[in-house]
Amino acid sequence: MFLYGGKTDLYNAFGYDAAPWNNDLLFLSLSTAFDPSVPPWQYVSGSENTSISSQGPTLAWHTVSAFNSSFSLIFGGSTGPLSPTLPDNSDSAQLLNPMQPLFITLPEGWAGEPQRRMRHATASINGSLYIIGGETADGSGNLFSTHYLFNPSTPIFIQLPSQNAPPGIMGHAAVILPDGRLLVFGGISGGQLVPFSSCWVLDTTQSNLMWALASIDQSSLPSARSSFAFVLLSDGRILIQGGTDATFEAAFDDGWILDPSRSPMTWTQVPALSQLGGRKDHFAVNAGGQVVFGFGAPSHFSLRPPC
């Protein structure tokens, strides 16, 4: 597992948004067992290793999405207040080969890329990447209601249909199920948290892509939230944990599982996930039947079965 960029605050000296940006590329092997209290992260490249000539920019709230066995697309993100990068330009796309490591800077407008955005979500299937929503990186707080498909074989960014699509949204989840359905849920839209009774669906297996709303059982729902961790489990269910409110001040500790195979789809709370504590902007990864959680605010590292 590779992790790139983000924010660090070793001495808790900054507010969350003001914490320093970084360009660190880290690696953690998930092929062997390890003690989650001392995870064996390897520092691959970044400002602390100037012997590596190929390095990426400082970034936060971006995405890194693998589209084949060698390369990933870095897209969007905030470069920080001291960066010379213009936040409204369409120049955020980069290619990364983490094994080298090799960062490839691309020209503005490459492959018809859209404007830089942050706090968006991406999901991939069969080499294609879906980029959903996001917030402008210029501090205005404006949200994007335009969503894109990135086809790396051409390469080209293609705007997805707007009819019945998610509105301007950020801090949400985008997950592609084994059957090819893309689900989008949670986050913030119009200054309000999006309730988990809303879930947008796009069947990526169809040649004519069309958005629809999923049917969700209303009897048991997580409280609305943004910036939560989410992961697709091996059995096709989706796990979420933590997150924050619309002001980004709270840090929730509860966890839930969505079963999209049922009609209507159902949410079930998993009490054990509250042991992780409250956190936001963290990650969750499925590793051989267990879920690895890490980082976020507040930050620590944990390993839990998916329940």
Protein language model annotation of sequence segments:
Residues M1-C307:
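Kelch-like beta-propeller repeat domains
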